[in-house]
């Protein structure tokens, strides 16, 4: 795939990927991709990531049903970060049951939770 030739994966063969709600612009999550997951994302028009902890390809929503449909894909000026503009199915992108993984805000010296849980993770994952 010629589009992948300009992408700069790191020494581990990975590239950071940010997902953003295509309608609101809200940043939903950060994950890693490898060449295979990026190819699958482009081919299937569905977010596919690489799990460093599990050392395997991870289809977003494969367990939870919270799939990310791709609307647009961007790379940054250095071609070393991917931005996915997505439609989040089910309204939950974070494994904590929230719309976004970025739900903690620094309030002077402490982290404050600013977003409510939409669904308890036990109800999502069992």
Curated annotation (Swiss-Prot):
Pathway: Amino-acid biosynthesis; L-histidine biosynthesis; L-histidine from 5-phospho-alpha-D-ribose 1-diphosphate: step 3/9. Keywords: Amino-acid biosynthesis, Cytoplasm, Histidine biosynthesis, Hydrolase, Magnesium, Metal-binding, Zinc. GO terms for molecular function: magnesium ion binding; phosphoribosyl-AMP cyclohydrolase activity; zinc ion binding. It is found in: Cytoplasm. One of its GO terms (cellular component) is cytoplasm. It catalyses: 1-(5-phospho-beta-D-ribosyl)-5'-AMP + H2O = 1-(5-phospho-beta-D-ribosyl)-5-[(5-phospho-beta-D-ribosylamino)methylideneamino]imidazole-4-carboxamide. Binds 1 Mg(2+) ion per subunit. Binds 1 zinc ion per subunit. Mg(2+) binds at residues 76, 78, 80. Signal peptide: none annotated. InterPro entries: PRA-CH, PRib_AMP_CycHydrolase_dom, PRib_AMP_CycHydrolase_sf. PANTHER family: HISTIDINE BIOSYNTHESIS BIFUNCTIONAL PROTEIN, HISTIDINE BIOSYNTHESIS BIFUNCTIONAL PROTEIN HIS7. Catalyzes the hydrolysis of the adenine ring of phosphoribosyl-AMP. HAMAP family: HisI. Homodimer. This is Phosphoribosyl-AMP cyclohydrolase. The gene is hisI.
């Amino acid at each position: 795939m010629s589009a992948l030739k300009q992408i700069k994966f790191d020494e581990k063969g990975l590239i950071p990927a940010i997902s953003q709600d295509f309608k609101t612009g809200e940043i939903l999550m950060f994950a890693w991709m490898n060449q295979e997951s990026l190819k699958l994302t482009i081919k299937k028009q569905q977010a596919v990531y690489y799990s460093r902890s599990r050392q395997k390809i991870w289809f977003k929503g494969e367990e939870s049903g919270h799939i990310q449909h791709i609307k647009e894909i961007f790379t940054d000026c250095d071609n070393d970060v991917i931005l996915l503009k997505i439609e989040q199915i089910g309204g939950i992108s974070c494994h904590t049951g929230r719309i976004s993984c970025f739900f903690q805000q620094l309030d002077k010296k402490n982290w404050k939770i600013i977003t409510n849980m939409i669904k308890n993770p036990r109800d999502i994952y069992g």
